[in-house]
Amino acid sequence: MASHLELNNGTKMPTLGLGTWKSPPGQVTEAVKVAIDMGYRHIDCAQVYQNEKEVGVALQEKLKEQVVKRQDLFIVSKLWCTFHDQSMVKGACQKTLSDLQLDYLDLYLIHWPTGFKPGPDYFPLDASGNVIPSDTDFVDTWTAMEQLVDEGLVKAIGVSNFNPLQIERILNKPGLKYKPAVNQIECHPYLTQEKLIEYCHCKGIVVTAYSPLGSPDRPWAKPEDPSLLEDPRIKEIAAKYNKTTAQVLIRFPIQRNLVVIPKSVTPARIAENFKVFDFELSNEDMATLLSYNRNWRVCALMSCAKHKDYPFHAEV
């Protein structure tokens, strides 16, 4: 299987990256340094993770040590929902670049299709606990994203958590300059996303799978939630290949021609998660893993369920 996938702008994106969502600032610098030393070249970041400065420290250290050159790294970040207004997009991108200590990003994504009221709160809520929307349209936000490419701040642009109807609106935008290169979505055996992936691939859009292990460290986990890592059926498949459950869960999207970004701050796990290119799941095991779909989401963003651009109402 390819260790890179080609984006629609001709650049190559490593199929395995290090996720940094929920990585504590005190641990993420070391995690990124360890990952780069082990061979990771793709790091997935976002302003809302509130740890980009610490990621930047690690990147600078490895660049200074000449462990890697900048052109060998593939750095992704995301525009947060409170910055969807066209006038705010460039400033948000520049803040990320400054925190990461970089001149450009390889890929910049609209993190969610939902625009939020601008201000200091990442999740501005009303008295009922619903998010306060902004008067913005992600199609207009996309125009500002395109300008970032023209100005050399980012090499490629894409989306995250968008459904096919929302992507279609961007593709049909009058005067579209750049198609989305990537759609980053939650994807694992309990949420296989077959229709959405088929749609994206059909449009030449690469799909990145986040939370491939089911995000066991999510703060809102409930005891009764299903656990991918503890699923005896997946453990059984892993034993057959002499691999860990995590390695099977990371290999699964790679064989579906997806990019995958498991998160860890533990050096042993960061290493384990990278050892997925020396085995191949059989067609039968791939089909079995796909059959475990139950449309179960780690990241349902329920506080936005009433937002006009909430992406998960329609199974389209």
Swiss-Prot record:
UniProt-listed SUPFAM superfamilies: NAD(P)-linked oxidoreductase
EC number(s) stated in the UniProt entry for this protein: 1.1.1.21, 1.1.1.300, 1.1.1.372, 1.1.1.54
Signal peptide: none
Subcellular location(s) per record: Cytoplasm
Biological process according to GO: cellular hyperosmotic salinity response; cellular response to methylglyoxal; cellular response to peptide; daunorubicin metabolic process; doxorubicin metabolic process; epithelial cell maturation; fructose biosynthetic process; inner medullary collecting duct development
N-acetylalanine: residues carrying this PTM: 2
Protein name (Swiss-Prot/TrEMBL): Aldo-keto reductase family 1 member B1
UniProt organism field: Rattus norvegicus (Rat)
